[in-house]
């Protein structure tokens, strides 16, 4: 059985949100560039309040009324409100990226400039979370075919350079990509965004498309696949809970306790006793918090090293 890894990028593979890092590039290349980045931060927050969701977001996601096993037949019904909430957030995100497009902040920046910038920012792999490279060499048998990135980041070129493995296919990176100038002779950005991947609902939709395409290929070859989706934030939760994946929420509670509690207790609804056990210094490195059809599950995992051990244990079952 092939193990397929589909991972978020920012704060899952990386230590920080690198969208903020990418935002520095236009101003490094042109220190006199206007408007300053604070303008776009304000635009985002203004849009967040202006387009605030007025519907019902049913939290926690795993309430007492949720069946113990998530399946293809009940997923859309169980998480209908969350799908609507995440889809509504497209309005907020579009308001923000449309302003960046309007101001042409990234227009004419070359792909080579982005690649060089990414390598400089990731000097000695400083952007990568501990254990990621070891995980890839130990778990991913064929990086060219078995590893995917699904992110709301802005640049395939940036993602590719930071991960740093030349075997990673460009076609296996899915993100809110900066568009390129249509002239094939010009390797630069035109200042616009793809805008297909902005929210958690976009992620789970594209995840389904990825799984369908891989399944089609595996069936032709007579193979079967085990899918793992790894993420760290609210935009990853629908993909983590998707019935076709073993889902992983990759957060170390010691490193980011407020984020951990918000997502695990308030949004997902994991029982406090399980959370307390996982939070402890001597607690487990990983913990299953829900079941899915076919023996799959969703897990809390503290690190890439712990995830390596979990996958190896699960694949031996």
Curated annotation (Swiss-Prot):
InterPro entries: HAD-like_hydrolase_phosphatase, HAD-like_sf, HAD_sf. Gene3D superfamilies: HAD superfamily/HAD-like. One of its GO terms (biological process) is phosphate ion transport. GO terms for molecular function: thiamine phosphate phosphatase activity. It comes from the Eukaryota. Protein required for cold tolerance. Plays a role in the regulation of phosphate uptake. PANTHER family: COLD TOLERANCE PROTEIN 1, UPF0655 PROTEIN YCR015C. Belongs to the CTO1 family. This is Cold tolerance protein 1. It comes from Saccharomyces cerevisiae (strain ATCC 204508 / S288c). The lineage of its organism: Eukaryota, Fungi, Dikarya, Ascomycota, Saccharomycotina. The gene is CTO1.
